[in-house]
């Protein structure tokens, strides 16, 4: 890829004074991935009227949207017991302007590659957490006239739904339109910094997501697996291929005839089985699948529209490789479906109560860079599959038209997978998955041959 020249870095602060003070975070904000999640948008050459002022439009509208989403302009601050809070101090977000001698056509199919790194603002997690911006953006102008925009958002502050809420409102303000949905900022609705109200706890506590994922048989840790070289691929599934998979899953004895399996349950079950085959596990190898659930509509009452924060939790489906491979697709899909159905209002409250009672939350946090031997790891023999199927991820328009491609920036941890809706919105999907290089060819073979 052609070299990139970084022209200038700006600190963007809210355009008007905003509330300042210490902002308690909910338990779901403080566990799991608390690093930044990058998303990339690619645009064709803007029309002549936008040629000289793309950067200014982005900066000005970003400053304005931060007035409404002011927590994003603050900084995290560590507290005792592995907790942290948000210091709403309006220190601002980072905006980088860069140029490339390359062309957008150099990226071919836009699969995440190491070349994407220079298009994304980098975060040094060795710096004190109090100094790290929670939102970073980089606009890169290419020689062909096209541009890329990378947005890197702290997962300690928001989940994907909330991040895209902010980004879409940024686009609306840039186009001269009013805010569509005012963010709901009060995290006390999830008892942030407060005790839970009394509730009846079911007799069985089964939050497997707080347990250590299985190791390979014969291993006592995952240190060696973390070191192995990985590769990311984007694998499309057409609507007809999806229909074949769903027919397979729903035709099994494990299916509920009244409901059937969802796209996510079906595709994720297929991915899980294919990964077990590709990795060459022994039949008795335990394997866990991490599933990310949006709890907004599962709470009683549901969280308010525009809730701005983390409202997702991870649940786990578990089996052995032998069970998954010897049984039909419907078996894997049924394990996933059952894990998802377990997420009720009571389940969420039990999880919050459990975390509130922990002496230290650090063991549940992932603030570690690629190559680290610390933090949660859902690589071999495990997987984590996240759905972006219902996220409003397409159509980000700042005035010069919608992007022609958007997708994840990087996804370099073994076992990490995303299921994305295809950009043509015809019901087809794309699997973005990262596996060890040694396993990928076999995985791709099974992924398509087993449909």
Swiss-Prot record:
Keywords from the named record: Acyltransferase, Transferase
Pfam family, one: Transferase
InterPro entries registered for this protein in UniProt: CAT-like_dom_sf, Plant_Fungal_Acyltransferase
UniProt GO BP: pollen development; pollen exine formation; spermidine hydroxycinnamate conjugate biosynthetic process
Name of the protein described by the UniProt record: Spermidine hydroxycinnamoyl transferase
Gene3D superfamilies, per the entry: Chloramphenicol acetyltransferase-like domain
Active site, renumbered: 155 (proton acceptor), 397 (proton acceptor)
Gene knockout outcome: Glossy and sticky pollen, but very little changes in the exine patterns. Drastic reduction in flower buds of the content in N1,N4,N8-tri-(hydroxyferuloyl)-spermidine and N1,N4-di(hydroxyferuloyl)-N8-sinapoyl-spermidine.
Organism expressing this protein natively: Arabidopsis thaliana
Family affiliation: Belongs to the plant acyltransferase family.
């Amino acid at each position: 890829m052609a070299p990139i020249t970084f022209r200038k870095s700006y600190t963007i602060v809210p355009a008007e004074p905003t509330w300042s003070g210490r902002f308690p975070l909910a338990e779901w904000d403080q566990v799991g991935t608390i690093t930044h999640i990058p998303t990339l948008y690619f645009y064709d050459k803007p029309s002549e009227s936008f040629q000289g002022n793309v950067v200014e439009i982005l900066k000005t509208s970003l400053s304005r949207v931060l007035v409404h989403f002011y927590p994003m302009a603050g900084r995290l601050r560590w507290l005792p017991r592995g907790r942290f809070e948000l210091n709403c101090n309006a220190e601002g977000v980072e905006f980088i302007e860069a140029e490339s001698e390359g062309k957008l056509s150099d990226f071919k199919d836009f699969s995440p590659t190491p070349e994407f790194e220079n298009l994304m603002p980098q975060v040094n997690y060795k710096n004190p957490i109090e100094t790290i911006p929670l939102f970073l953006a980089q606009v890169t102008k290419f020689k062909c006239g096209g541009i890329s925009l990378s947005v890197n958002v702290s997962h300690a502050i928001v989940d994907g739904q909330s991040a895209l809420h902010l980004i879409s409102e940024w686009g609306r303000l840039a186009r001269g339109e009013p805010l569509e949905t005012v963010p709901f900022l009060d995290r006390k609705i999830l008892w942030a910094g407060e005790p839970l109200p009394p509730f009846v706890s079911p007799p069985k506590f089964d939050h497997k997501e707080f347990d250590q994922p299985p190791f390979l048989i014969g291993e006592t840790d995952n240190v060696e697996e973390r070191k192995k070289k990985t590769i990311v691929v984007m694998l499309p599934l057409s609507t007809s291929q999806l229909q074949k998979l769903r027919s397979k899953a729903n035709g099994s004895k494990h299916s509920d005839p009244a409901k059937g399996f969802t796209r996510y349950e079906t595709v994720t079950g297929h991915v899980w089985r294919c990964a077990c085959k590709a990795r060459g596990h022994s039949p008795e190898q335990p394997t866990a699948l991490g599933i990310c659930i949006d709890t907004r509509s599962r709470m009683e009452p549901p969280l308010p529209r525009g809730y701005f924060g983390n409202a997702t939790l991870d649940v786990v489906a578990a089996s052995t490789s032998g069970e998954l491979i010897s049984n039909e697709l419907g078996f894997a899909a049924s394990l996933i479906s059952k894990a998802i159905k377990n997420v009720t209002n009571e389940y969420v409250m039990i999880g919050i109560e459990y975390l509130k009672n922990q002496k230290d939350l650090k063991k549940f946090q992932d603030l570690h860079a690629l190559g680290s031997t610390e933090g949660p790891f859902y690589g071999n023999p495990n997987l984590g599959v996240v759905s972006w199927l219902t996220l409003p991820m397409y159509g980000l328009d700042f005035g010069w038209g919608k992007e022609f491609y958007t997708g994840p920036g990087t996804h370099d941890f073994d076992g990490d997978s995303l299921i994305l809706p295809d950009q043509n919105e015809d019901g087809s999907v794309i699997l973005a998955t990262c596996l060890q290089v040694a396993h990928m060819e076999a995985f791709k073979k099974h992924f398509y041959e087993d449909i």
